[in-house]
Amino acid sequence: MSKVFSLSSGFSPAGDQPTAINQLLEGLDSGLAHQTLLGVTGSGKTFTIANVIAESNRPTFIMAPNKTLAAQLYGEMKEFFPDNAVEYFVSYYDYYQPEAYVPTTDTFIEKDASVNAHIEQMRLSATKALLERRDVIIIASVSAIYGLGDPDSYLKMMLHVRRGDMLNQRDILRRLAELQYTRNDVSFERGHFRVRGEVIDVFPAESEHDAIRIELFDDEVECINVFDPLTGAVLQKDLPRCTIYPKTHYVTPREKILEAIEKIKDELVVRRKQLMDSNKLVEEQRISQRTQFDIEMMNELGFCSGIENYSRYLSGREEGEPPPTLFDYLPADGLLIIDESHVTVSQIGAMYRGDRSRKENLVEYGFRLPSALDNRPMKFEEFASLAPQTIYVSATPGKYEIEQSGNDIAEQVVRPTGLLDPIIEVRPVATQVDDLLSEIRIREVKGERVLVTTLTKRMSEDLAEYLAEHNVKVRYLHSDIDTVERVEIIRDLRLGVFDVLVGINLLREGLDIPEVSLVAILDADKEGFLRSERSLIQTIGRAARNLEGRAILYGDKITGSMERAIFETNRRREKQALHNKKNGITPQGLNKKVGDILELGKPSSRSRTNKAAQLNRVAESKGTYVNLSPQQLELEIQRLETEMYDLAQNLEFEKAAEARDKIHTLRQQFIMNS
């Protein structure tokens, strides 16, 4: 099979990377279901995985534990594979309040959600890429295990148009309406179509820039063009065929909807009898009214609010069967990479239970039929049985990953840069704050940064206040600070706006700060979740990207977790030093641009570029939008869209195109903020 992935990098594998790459590839070729890449912080695990993807030549899912790390991986993979389909699949909700009922106060909470249109477009683009090509890398969060439209129904609903086909104009419009596209002859936006005589323009839901024009003559498809919806410029002329994908993943053919309605009616009869027999008259009246309304909507429009609660019938699955998810779109020979697996794996297991308890209340009190319980994320057992060949990636793999992998663990301890793991010291608790202050003074003079981790939010606030009183430039992180502000705080730390960052459990996975030379762990001898072996190794690893990396553990005794973490760090350090000595390597500090943490990858060389997008105007800085809040970004996007349409109406297309390119930049930034 010819290679479909093209890895673009100025580096070649070094350190432990070549050995790890070969071991993982051999495992995949021999059919191993589970492997683990145990890679220390800063050892280039992402580059190793990129090489494995390129060599294995298979469609790949990479699952990350949160949106921040998913965005970071998306940016890195876009740079490694500029000519391949690197897609982003995370939850498209900016805000989500699920349907719920609180029996104690008799309070029903309606579902309320705000959908991020740009991320919705990226999700649709991801499934389209999986259906059309093999050179696909999907960066996903745990939302990938939640129910998605059935791929068979999705494929059946696609509209194929070929040049020379005999198609009635009204039939095309009817099919577009079935795909949930909206006709709008005035404002032409994504997910809309417009009609001008026998010319039909469609703006595909999964497309960011390009629209399709279908020209008919006497019910024959005469010409198919791709054009820029803003300027009207034709980009590709006279295509032989085109495929229009549904506007949403949750579309269903008419005959399936009618079948589902009959099954819903049957279930409603059974449920009403159960409630009447239990003398639950209010619940019986409630479920009858709500379900009848949904049935009417589905009959007339083909969908209803909360249609996902009938997914069992719409996807043709039996009671208790797993819902269709993104994994159903992945080819049989696909590859799954689970990043930071010690966190991600446990998240996968937790999703089902939380969702179940909320829905049981809705069913019991007559807000939903029992079949709504099958609208759920996958159970962990279902995920495990459905997952393709899997590689777990972590500096501290969990018990599950190690058990599943057995002896198939690829160690990546030696860094390409020759950097060693931090030196660890244990110091008494009694003088920890004053001792820490003196260590901070030493780092301030050198222009280095310090991370401090405490046990409670109150402790972090008090410590930050104490350090500030002693003229230390300090900030603290805790769970109340949202993702965007957290990224900005980390960026300010790297830029030297302040020198010390105090936190609780946030200074761990994916925190890439080469300027940090000291990690201080207060009350390290308090055994528990925050001071477990895995947590300690992860936290110590934050200083592993600096030549002067050092970790101080404050404790009056050495706990089992401390002992194991110190032993493992020292073992790695000895192995790294031996490799450096053997190969004559001098350790080199990392020099990573500060802006990198917020970048989401460069556009592919295939994508249509515009000179106005590439060149910054006079006095326009590249990072203009980096520090804007999500609300400010949204307002700026709305302002620019209004300006763009006004310019287009005034026939000032060059200026309108500049505004469009600015909107594109803002939307890329918005992914990180969502």
UniProtKB/Swiss-Prot annotation:
Role, per record = The UvrABC repair system catalyzes the recognition and processing of DNA lesions. A damage recognition complex composed of 2 UvrA and 2 UvrB subunits scans DNA for abnormalities. Upon binding of the UvrA(2)B(2) complex to a putative damaged site, the DNA wraps around one UvrB monomer. DNA wrap is dependent on ATP binding by UvrB and probably causes local melting of the DNA helix, facilitating insertion of UvrB beta-hairpin between the DNA strands. Then UvrB probes one DNA strand for the presence of a lesion.
Q: Say which family it is in.
A: Belongs to the UvrB family.
Q: How does it assemble?
A: Forms a heterotetramer with UvrA during the search for lesions. Interacts with UvrC in an incision complex.
The reply to whether Nucleotide-binding figures as a keyword in the UniProt entry is yes
Q: Which parts of the sequence form the motif Beta-hairpin?
A: 92-115
Q: What is this protein called?
A: UvrABC system protein B
Organism the protein comes from: Photobacterium profundum (strain SS9)
Name of encoding gene:
uvrB
Recorded hits in InterPro entries, A to Z, give: Helicase/UvrB_N, Helicase_ATP-bd, Helicase_C-like, P-loop_NTPase, UVR_dom, UVR_dom_sf, UvrB, UvrB_inter
The entry's localization annotation reads:
Cytoplasm
Is Cytoplasm one of the keywords? Answer: yes
Taking every annotated instance into account, which residue ranges of this chain make up the domain Helicase C-terminal?
432-586
Q: Which SUPFAM superfamilies match?
A: C-terminal UvrC-binding domain of UvrB, P-loop containing nucleoside triphosphate hydrolases
Q: Tell me the domain comment.
A: The beta-hairpin motif is involved in DNA binding.
Which controlled-vocabulary keywords does the entry list? ATP-binding, Cytoplasm, DNA damage, DNA excision, DNA repair, Excision nuclease, Nucleotide-binding, SOS response
Quick one: which residues bind ATP? 39-46
| GO CC annotations on file | cytoplasm; excinuclease repair complex
Family annotation (NCBIfam families): PRK05298.1, uvrb
Q: Name one GO biological process term.
A: nucleotide-excision repair
The GO molecular function terms of this record are:
ATP binding; ATP hydrolysis activity; DNA binding; excinuclease ABC activity
Domain UVR: residue ranges: 634-669
Residue span(s) of domain Helicase ATP-binding = 26-414
